[in-house]
């Protein structure tokens, strides 16, 4: 596709901001796998009790991805990413904070707290892929989306890789709660970038609209 330099530059800014935000959110999703042994040690929980935190969250994520699609279509990808990332940073922080809530004890009450908080995190996490795809659909012609899909996949793997690279030293040097606090802080930074840098389409930046030639354009020929 023959795009102007201004368009390419603005699209790259949009895409990189979304991509790094998505990676940051993945850090705030896979960090629990690093914290599991420390939760077990701190509270004396077995695998079944840890599973009681993870299983409801997986169910919530699967259902939310289905139900949040229409919401994303209605409010737009930019708002959806802001909602999802803000929720993820809040509930990652609250999960880490649970380690300091001694008044909840170490039994079923604390377990219920962690399970509830992680399920809320999963709900907001479900917005991320929906929002990213929605926004980029307005910036990429249908013939360019193969490249977009490849980069999208790389961002997913990047987020998974980062939490294990960054999270390992965190849990080695700091209390386990920081494996939730640090991703929360990174997501907070990216929310700011999304707010100021991301737009749903070229027309929102004062550029000419792009005919993406998919079903949304009304003419695929």
Regions found by a protein language model. Give the residues of each.
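Hydrophobic core of transmembrane alpha-helices in multi-pass small-molecule transporters
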Residues: 91, 105-127
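C-terminal ends and interior cores of transmembrane alpha-helices
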Residues: 86-107
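Helix-loop-helix hairpin linking two adjacent transmembrane segments in secondary transporters
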Residues: 156-202
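Extracytoplasmic
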Residues: 13-47
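Flexible cytoplasmic inter-helical loops of multi-pass small-molecule transporters
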Residues: 198-221
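Cytoplasmic helix-loop-helix junction between adjacent transmembrane helices
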Residues: 117-157
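Residue-level signature of mid-helix packing/kink "hotspots" within the transmembrane helices
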Residues: 30, 58-66, 160-161
């Amino acid at each position: 596709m023959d795009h102007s330099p201004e368009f390419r530059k603005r699209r790259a800014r949009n895409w990189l901001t979304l991509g790094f935000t998505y990676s940051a959110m993945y850090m705030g999703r896979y960090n629990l796998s690093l914290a599991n042994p420390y939760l077990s040690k701190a509270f004396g929980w077995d695998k079944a009790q840890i599973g009681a935190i993870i299983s409801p969250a997986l169910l919530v994520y699967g259902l939310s991805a289905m139900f949040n699609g229409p919401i994303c279509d209605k409010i737009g990808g930019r708002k959806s990413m802001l909602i999802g990332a803000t929720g993820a940073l809040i509930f990652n922080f609250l999960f880490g904070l649970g380690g300091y809530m001694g008044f909840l004890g170490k039994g079923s009450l604390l377990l219920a707290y962690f399970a509830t908080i992680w399920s809320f995190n999963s709900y907001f996490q479900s917005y991320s892929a929906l929002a990213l795809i929605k926004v980029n659909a307005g910036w990429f012609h249908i013939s360019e989306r193969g490249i977009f899909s490849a980069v999208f996949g790389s961002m997913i793997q990047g987020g998974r890789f980062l939490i294990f690279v960054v999270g390992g030293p965190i849990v080695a040097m700091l209390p386990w709660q920081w494996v939730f606090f640090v991703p929360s802080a990174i997501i907070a930074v990216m929310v700011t970038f999304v707010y100021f840098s991301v737009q749903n389409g070229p027309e929102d930046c004062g550029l000419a609209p792009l005919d993406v030639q998919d079903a949304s354009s009304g003419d695929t020929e």
